[in-house]
Amino acid sequence: MSHSVLVIGSGGREHAICWKLSQSTLVKQIYALPGSFGIQQVEKCRNLDAKVLDPKDFEAIAKWSKKNEISLVVVGPEDPLALGLGDVLQKEGIPCFGPGKQGAQIEADKKWAKDFMLRHGIPTARYESFTDTNKAKAFIRSAPYQALVVKAAGLAAGKGVVVAANVDEACQAVDEILGDLKYGQAGATLVVEELLEGEEISVLAFTDGKSVRAMLPAQDHKRLGNGDTGPNTGGMGAYCPCPLISQPALELVQRAVLERAVQGLIKERITYQGVLYAGLMLTRDGPRVLEFNCRFGDPETQVILPLLETDLFEVMQACCSGQLDRLPLQWRSGVSAVGVVLASAGYPETSTKGCLITGLPDVNSPTQLIFHSGLSVNKQKEALTNGGRVLIAIALDASLKEAAAKATKLAGTITFAGTGAQYRTDIAQKAFKIAIATAPGLSYKDSGVDIDAGDALVQRIKPLSRGTQRPGVLGGLGGFGGLFRLKDLSYKEPVIAEATQGVGAKIQLALQNELYENIGYDLFAMSANDLLELGAEPVAFLDYIACGKLHVPLAAQLVKGMADGCRDAKCALVGGETAEMPSLYAPGQHDMAGYCVGIVEQARVLPRFDLYEPEDLLVGLPSSGLHCAGFNEILTQLAASKVNLKECSPVGGGKHGLSLAQVLGTPTRLYVQQLLPHLQAGNQIKAVAHVTHGLLHDVQRLLPEGFEVTLDFGAVPVPDVFGWLAGQLQLSAQTLLERHNCGIGMVLVLPQSSLLWRTALPGAKVLGVLNRQAKASGGAPRVKVRNFVEQLQKLAAPFGGLGETQLPEEVKDVPSSGVKATTREECFENAVGRRLTRVPNHYVDPILILGTDGVGTKLKIAQQTHRNASVGIDLVAMCVNDILCNGAEPFSFSSYYACGKWQAALAAEVNAGVQEGASQANSSFVASHSAALPLLYEPQVYDLAGFALGIAERSGILPRLDEIQPGDVLIGLPSSGVHSNGFSLVHAVLKRAGLGLNDRAPFSEKTLGEELLVPTKIYVKALSALLSRPNHGIKALAHITGGGLSENIPRVLRKELAVRLDANKYPLPPVFAWLAAAGNISSTELQRTYNCGLGLVLVVGATEVDGVLRELRYPQRASVVGEVVARKDPKKPQVVVQNFEASLARTQRMLSQPRKRVAVLISGKGSNLQALIDAIRDSAQGVYAEIVLVISNKAGVLGLERAAKAGIPSMVISHKDFPSREVYDVELTRHLKTARVEFICLAGFMRILSVPFVREWRGRLINIHPSLLPKFPGLHVQKQALEAGETESGCTVHYVDEGVDTGAIIVQAAVPILPGDDEETLTQRIHYAEHWAFPRALALLASGALRRVSEVKKEAPKDIKDSQ
């Protein structure tokens, strides 16, 4: 270790060079001139103060180097090389890593470099050079190729290149660079090049002037903003190695670029040693050189050198001694480096100095590096910004994707005080996009969900459903809901009863032993038996089946079991939901929930506690076995005891050859046929309890305050299966009484004189008689048992006898969430608190409409992010939106919640969301069936199912299929995002993109978890008033749910009709554009899976469109989105979406650019400011902007409070503090420019702006005015409209020009003037229109959809209006 090295420079590149050189065992001391604080911290490094040695005095540098025995001088920046430092050092015999002045021309003189490439056959873009602006511009306009790249020929710190979007921009660049000498003499000669298309990469090479060795390829990111937007910079980040260049292409670069360049230098007798940097464009015709540089690139160096394994000092020494060919270059394999540059505010135009930097890591590590570019320290040793590019955060990882994520995260932890830091969040994303583009496109089926299998199941079970039809049923499976006509029954005062049930872990036993039909029967029996408790006749049933992988024959057998139960009870199977959720359920795993609706006469509702008398009989009806209680623990303990359930059973039907599984899996007994006639007679049965939780628990429910009972098993046989179970698992008698039915499936309360149990209820036994509870009984149990233990002991003796093992409770009560549940006036509670619904008298021919759904694997996102409060809203939305499509007014809602580990707080959080959703849907929340089932679910996993009931007048049932005809209009109500379908595909996309739910969404400022959990929109309140009118004009509604646009709209069309949608007429939420790009999802698959921005589609007669839009346009952002057409070819799809690809591409292009920076100027309440804030923060609206500043000319106004609440910077600039309008506006402009504002919205800003201000912001300044311009400009416009007798008013968003409200119109929104209106009522109505129009206009402006204002004709705004 004997060598000393001098490094010239002070930036991040030099920091990285010093860091790498310090690792050499051959280097003892490194001097940096002038160096930096970061370099000073590197081992072996020492800064040389510029006061001691002037970096510009090359002779002094040479003299100092000789005196201090410097073995090697490494020149970092290009300027010293271009000015001849290398020549001075070489003359004095000091080795210099870097070429002399002649060699540096390859970078310093772009004209010379282009001529050099031409002379030596190096592939590059076509070009011409100029010293005259007019000639340059004439060439640009007439060139036979796209001459749009304009370069200053000299050195301009990496900023002297403009890649113009069009000829005008290129000519403007000529004027600035050559005409105005923006970069001084560097731009005195201009190079105009052909615009090449492709990816830009950097290949740096070491050369000794004879041989050349390429380094690993890297990619720099020159533009300031994400998506390569904004001005050129010195480089905002880089990554290495870059996979965009193939090995054959890299070999071509070695031969045709690097070696030809070195040979050319030799031919022209130019000595060159150091780095030869080739900036390349990977075109269709192969790599083309954009530029050469004569030094290490910045920031490429910072990501290349960490991957170099060979001693850097040895490499540099070999370059200077002409021995590079003898030294093998070694690179780290399987490692990627990504660097993210943090720049100060205002860069590249200005730089901020002296801002405190916090969050810097204490030290560098093998996987995390910080190199300083423009950083200084104060006296307290605190880090401060000291330039444009301040530092670079680097991460190394085996995965490029992980390295990028870690580098971006590291950058995000570092903050600059004051105006903050600028950094890109998309460094290396191009590499991923290429990988995505070349990867096969994802589909819903690829993610584990097969829509075709779901359709096949529907077709398979339709005959099963038809077999359960009974009077009252309308329609069939496959619509949005199940329909039942009450008039077909003979009830005078009908009351609707509802029951929701599950089968617990018994389904696991059924699946493992192929008892599919049994468990389906169980589900129906559990639900229907529950209705008997209310005295109700089961009339309609819905099922919910969830699984990891849908196996159609198995699911069909489950449904067959349900259908068998329905037939036995004369109840109709009217619909169901089958959810395939591979990320919630493992393959082969299932769960089920059932929902049964019954009808009971108002006077027959049970229980009738008011009729109870002492000595009333408690009668038990025998169960068929265990029914469905407690199977989670039973199966767990049996498995632990290694009991083989496939062996012949020693009890029950074992003597007939049944296995233990078959005995335990015996279906629940259905009591409907046995009890319903007596319940409807209404003269004997006072109460009914279905034993589902455990005999003691359910008998207790039959006892009102003041009654007790003793259950006597002396004459009541206990089935031997309970004895086997108790002996096998060493259970106590008490735990069986608490958790199982013990042979009693249903308990009735009958009068003492009743003989019903003897004459009409086979197997019925009197269990006990009701008694008045003694007043002094204290805390004694009100349900006592005798003769049970003795009987059970005998039954258990052959199997090991009784023990003390306890069984846990499986069915749970959800604790109160604090959310007040909605209760409609039709809803009431019976004597034990169960909710029922009266059918309102105003219905002439009421139709019950039932719907069920789940939330799908959106639940997984809630569970992973611990954000479970909103999925209940999704659940309600998915159900009520469906029944809304049948014209129903939702009345009640019930839910099913099953989980792995019971967490009361989690259950309460989810249930609170369900109740909030029910409230939004104006529905009574009836009940939630909740169960903890560790055998079915992982500890942190839960599933949800929902069941909605609505009522419609028969004359109002939708869809009106016969009335729909070509020419009918489609009106779309926007979705709030993904809603609750297609999330299995979302999970697949996230996995492919390497993104987590806590990562920031690529399409908004929120996290992906927050965006994806935006609740499904509930459309009930939006449409209820409209649907309640007799002639509302709506022929059909289609809820765009599972199956997307392609499969939901056809559900309301006859086969000979189709629809034509126009994607230009409604916004595509950015989330879908991102999903399509990240998952390479085809447009067809996207439309078949997602709502694509339309949550609900209305089919409306052409003459009724205006009336419907009048109700829905402003509050719901409804718009005309298409029309019904004749379907001429039955093989063609029924849904055609025109312009979808263009809309998708437009949105994706928008996402690749930075959000537009907007300022809002106010003077008062700021209601329009709030509308803009809300729209921008709702990513589904696609307003790709951010409000960065709010300015008020008045202090203390509400608008400032709104800004503060939203976290938006605001200020008061009072016009009273300035001598003139012009001076005031100059101050406004100063603050607007400091905030880098691009567009200004005037939202009630009560100032007339000066002409200079308007001209400076022309085309970027918009206002909202409360009239339909050009009518009524200026003030007091509502008064003018009323006095003029107008029948219509509204608002106008327009560009601001020098006149008063005379600028080009962007958007107009009309409202009617109604009889009796005054200024206040009209103003309020216009406000609603303003809150729709202003965000819409800003969306158009931010997206670039509007033409430049100079091209807009004021008198003909229609073109712009039509572009909405």
Curated annotation (Swiss-Prot):
Chain segments carrying region GART: 1155-1364
EC number: 6.3.4.13, 6.3.3.1, 2.1.2.2
Stretches the record annotates as AIRS: 435-1154
Catalytic reaction annotation: 5-phospho-beta-D-ribosylamine + glycine + ATP = N(1)-(5-phospho-beta-D-ribosyl)glycinamide + ADP + phosphate + H(+); 2-formamido-N(1)-(5-O-phospho-beta-D-ribosyl)acetamidine + ATP = 5-amino-1-(5-phospho-beta-D-ribosyl)imidazole + ADP + phosphate + H(+); N(1)-(5-phospho-beta-D-ribosyl)glycinamide + (6R)-10-formyltetrahydrofolate = N(2)-formyl-N(1)-(5-phospho-beta-D-ribosyl)glycinamide + (6S)-5,6,7,8-tetrahydrofolate + H(+)
PROSITE patterns: ATP_GRASP, GARS, GART
UniProt-recorded Gene Ontology molecular function terms: ATP binding; metal ion binding; phosphoribosylamine-glycine ligase activity; phosphoribosylformylglycinamidine cyclo-ligase activity; phosphoribosylglycinamide formyltransferase activity
Record-linked SUPFAM superfamilies: Formyltransferase, Glutathione synthetase ATP-binding domain-like, PreATP-grasp domain, PurM C-terminal domain-like, PurM N-terminal domain-like, Rudiment single hybrid motif
GO biological process, any: adenine biosynthetic process
Record-annotated site: Raises pKa of active site His: D1301
Binding residue positions for N(1)-(5-phospho-beta-D-ribosyl)glycinamide: G1166, S1167, N1168, H1327, Y1328, A1329, E1330
Active site (catalytic residues): H1265
GO cellular component: cytosol
Sequence positions that bind (6R)-10-formyltetrahydrofolate: R1221, M1246, R1247, I1248, L1249, N1263, D1297, E1298, G1299, V1300, D1301
Function of the molecule: Trifunctional enzyme required for de novo purine biosynthesis.
Protein family: In the N-terminal section; belongs to the GARS family.
Name used for this protein in its record: Trifunctional purine biosynthetic protein adenosine-3
Species in which this protein is naturally found: Drosophila pseudoobscura pseudoobscura
UniProt gene name: ade3
